[in-house]
UniProtKB/Swiss-Prot annotation:
Keywords: ATP-binding, Kinase, Nucleotide-binding, Repeat, Transferase. MORN repeats lie at residues 77-99, 100-122, 123-145, 146-168, 169-191, 192-214, 215-237, 238-259. Residues 735-756 are annotated as: Activation loop. It catalyses: a 1,2-diacyl-sn-glycero-3-phospho-(1D-myo-inositol 4-phosphate) + ATP = a 1,2-diacyl-sn-glycero-3-phospho-(1D-myo-inositol-4,5-bisphosphate) + ADP + H(+). The lineage of its organism: Eukaryota, Viridiplantae, Streptophyta, Embryophyta, Tracheophyta. This is Phosphatidylinositol 4-phosphate 5-kinase 4. Residues 20-61 are annotated as: Disordered. Its EC number is 2.7.1.68. It comes from Arabidopsis thaliana (Mouse-ear cress).
Length: 779
């Protein structure tokens, strides 16, 4: 019997004897207690384990003690140890020469410590979950130093960087790059003080040379761009508009006296500035979070795999925890304890106390190991000749090629109100033989309509979409793919071959909603660079000629799951419970299956800086949708698990590295190295944004068996390193008469708060409440 089980039984025995002393029936209560027998594996420590483990204080599992261990791969650890992991203060030496001395928590570097590389580089400061995170000092092998704030191995916050060549930067950092306000001083004494963007001088700032000359004004990509003033040490100055393009340069010289205009060309400033380079600094060869611990698995138990439902319900709840402790006897009463209501209340109270103190959780069966879902096939059916929608696809591609190809580039993102007029549309006729403006084609004649073309052209520029790439994705030689089944609304979805864009057929009502809210949408996505709402790139209509005169409306959107990482799990989250579970058996669920609220078995933990930005942005996006009377939207979430064994089992964060006689050390496995490489490579940081390729931790949750519609399960303390992609989709449903009737009808049958069709204000509040429970700060 384990120590925890003994504690529970003793506590129960004390309570029962106290309440039943007058009746003297305490012994009968425990007459029916039976505890599952302990296996040989649980009770025995093998000789091999004793050979590999040397400890200065051999304590039982569950106690903190000092240990010195030479691990199977040659690594060495000395320090405090708890339940098969370094825990407390300790020193770990890797065989490649790396070393860590400092605080540990459950096998992860956590707290203060010092990490050393074989090159001589060191980091001394705060760690969190294996990452350099907090305040710390990094010293590179060539003498570079950075002292300041870190987030997940990246310089983030205020910090001072001293380069080996003598240059110094003192200012703000974001995701490893100079950002916002900062001062950069070169070794000759010249310095720039002002705004930065992505490690380049950009925005408003001042450059001062050692000879006393200075430039005050606006910058772009390291050079003056826009209005600015160049001042000489003698007091004369030049005011004007600056640019690398001589045709855009213009200004006026103001002498300090009557000297007149000097023999000076403003282009000399650009020539001079080109000599002042921004140092990129050194690149860390291997990050602390990439270092694995070769921790010996002392238990060597092989649990029988248990079937786990997609929502994580596996024998949970207090009743199931005590299935083998038959306190109340059999149903027939044979051997049952005669316990009155007073005793029951006392026992219930004791149970609640034990629950609060954590004893009950220790007896609950651990959930079955999680596995990578079965890989799904590439989504969609290729639309080739003979497909029922082949001509419709040709019409769409012809129209896009015509519409995008003829448009002039956008000069300004400031649009007139008339550009958003729903009547601002252009019809173009496409006969098979072609016209002066349209090419000949092999499809039947059709008409093409562009809605608010200038607005969507500006949106594409705002979202940094290259027109040529846009046309190539949709209209290239590769055909579109039609998803296997239409959506709940009856719309069809099409994917481009490169997965970058999704095309959806729309009802007339949805088109009206988008046109009505287009101005507000444009202003919102322009004001908030990190908005999570879906990106719209175009709105079009194909009108087929003939007796039917059928109209098909399309909206072109960004595909949220277009990523370099494979998506293992997908969730569509609304915050409601009615009908919010998958209708597929678990055997049919694969990586393409979109799961729902009641299928969710994780809480997602974001780093502090990202979490705060996430909270702000969700609030802003929901306020926008609420103002536009939009409801029934979802947060679409994709998860890429960074670590799994060769057998497909997910490896929790901080878990033991698979080694020993039961596993193949040379077997390939999915690693977090790719993501750590992304974090350490400055050229790839731009791909990380709010909702896009975000490193995070997913904590597994379990739902209680006595709670039918528990939206958010209870945390288990089991974490997984993940990359997350998420965004808000389905934002074209307003609270119209049909939704009001749906709400009234379903409210009679179900709990009104459990259904999706509710007033936009209530929907927004419920959505945020749910999302802020599912996403939390990683502290």
């Amino acid at each position: 019997m384990s120590k925890e089980q003994s504690c529970v039984l003793k506590a129960w025995e004390v309570t029962v004897r106290k309440t039943q002393q007058a009746k003297k029936r305490a012994n009968s209560i425990f007459g029916t207690v039976s505890v599952a027998p302990q296996t040989d594996d649980d009770a025995t420590t093998t000789t091999e384990e004793n050979d590999d483990e040397t400890s200065t204080n051999r304590s039982s599992i569950g106690e903190l003690y000092h240990a010195e261990r030479i691990l199977p791969n040659g690594d060495y650890y000395t320090g405090q140890w708890y339940d098969s992991f370094p825990h407390g203060h300790g020193k770990y030496l890797w065989t490649d020469g790396c070393m860590y001395i400092g605080d540990w928590y459950n096998g992860k570097t956590m707290g203060r410590g010092k990490f050393g590389w074989p090159s001589g580089a060191t980091y001394e400061g705060e760690f969190k979950s294996g990452y350099m995170d907090g305040v710390g000092l990094y010293t590179g092998p060539s003498g570079d130093t950075y002292k300041g704030q870190w987030v997940m191995n990246l310089k983030h916050g205020h910090g001072i960087k001293r380069f080996a060549n003598g240059d110094v930067y003192d200012g703000e950092w974001r995701r490893g790059l100079q950002e916002a306000q900062g001062k950069y001083q070169w070794r000759d004494g010249s310095y720039y003080m002002g705004e930065w963007k992505n490690a380049t001088i950009c925005g408003k700032g001042t450059f001062i040379w050692t000879d006393g000359n200075r430039y005050d004004g606006f910058w772009d990509d390291g050079f003056p761009r826009g209005n600015g003033t160049f001042k000489w040490a003698d007091g004369s100055f030049y005011v004007g508009h600056w640019s690398n393009d001589p045709e855009e340069m213009n200004g006026t010289y103001y002498p300090s006296g009557d000297d007149g205009s000097p023999e000076w060309d403003p282009k000399d400033v650009f020539t001079n500035l080109s000599e002042y380079k921004i140092c990129s600094g050194e690149r860390v060869p291997v990050l602390p979070s990439q270092k694995k611990l070769s921790v010996w698995n002392s238990s060597k138990r092989v649990e029988k795999p248990r079937r786990m439902s997609v929502d994580g319900r596996v024998s949970v709840g207090v009743d199931r925890a005590f299935e083998k402790m038959n306190m109340w006897g059999t149903e027939s009463g044979e051997g049952a304890a005669d316990i009155d209501s007073t005793t029951r209340r006392d026992l219930d109270a004791e149970m609640m106390r034990l629950e609060a103190e954590g004893f009950i959780q220790s007896l609950r069966p651990s959930p079955a190991p999680m596995r990578l879902p079965r890989a799904g096939r590439k989504q969609g059916e290729t639309i080739s000749k003979g497909h029922r929608n082949y001509e419709l696809m040709l019409n769409l591609q012809l129209g896009i090629r015509h519409a995008v190809g003829k448009q002039a580039p956008v000069v300004s993102l400031d649009l007139k109100h008339s550009a958003f007029d729903p009547k601002e549309k252009v019809w173009t006729r496409f006969p098979p033989e072609g016209t002066k403006y349209t090419p000949p084609h092999q499809s039947s004649e059709f008409k093409w309509k562009d809605y608010c073309p200038l607005v969507f052209r500006s949106l594409r520029k705002l979202f940094k979409v290259d027109p040529a790439d846009y046309m190539l994705s949709i209209c290239g030689n590769d055909a579109l793919r039609e998803l296997s089944s239409p959506g709940k609304s009856g719309s069809f979805f099409y994917l481009t071959n490169d997965d970058r864009y999704m095309i959806k057929t729309m009802k007339k009502s949805e088109t009206k909603v988008l046109l009505r809210m287009l101005a507000a949408y444009y202003n919102h996505v322009r004001a908030f660079e990190n908005t999570l709402v879906i990106r719209f790139y175009g709105l079009h209509c194909v009108k087929l000629t003939g007796p039917i005169q059928k109209k098909v409306r399309f909206v072109i959107m960004g595909n949220l799951f277009c990523s370099e990482y494979s998506i293992h799990r997908r969730f569509d989250l609304k915050g409601s419970s009615l009908g919010r579970t998958t209708d597929k058996p678990e055997s049919e669920i694969n990586s393409n299956t979109i799961l729902k609220d009641l299928d969710l078995n994780f809480i997602f933990r974001l780093q502090k800086a990202w979490y705060q930005e996430f909270i702000r942005q969700v609030d802003k996006d929901c306020e926008f949708l609420e103002q536009e009377r939009i409801m029934d939207y979802s947060l679409l979430v994709g998860i890429h698990f960074r670590e799994a064994s060769v057998a497909g089992e997910l490896i929790p964060s901080g878990a033991r590295t698979p080694i020993g006689e039961f596993e193949d050390e040379s077997a390939p496995r999915l690693s977090r190295a790719d993501v750590d490489q992304l974090l350490s490579d400055p050229t790839r940081w731009a791909s990380i944004r709010l909702g896009g390729n975000m490193p995070a931790r997913a904590e597994r949750t379990m739902r209680r068996s006595d709670c039918e519609f528990q939206l958010v399960g209870e945390p288990t303390g089991e974490y997984y390193e993940v990359v997350m992609i998420f965004g808000i989709i389905d934002i074209l449903q307003d609270y119209d008469i049909s939704k009001k009737l749906e709400h009234a009808y379903k409210s009679i049958q179900y709990d009104p708060t459990s259904i999706s069709a509710v007033d936009p204000r209530l929907y927004s509040r419920r959505f945020r409440d749910f999302i802020f429970k599912v996403f939390t700060e990683d502290n």
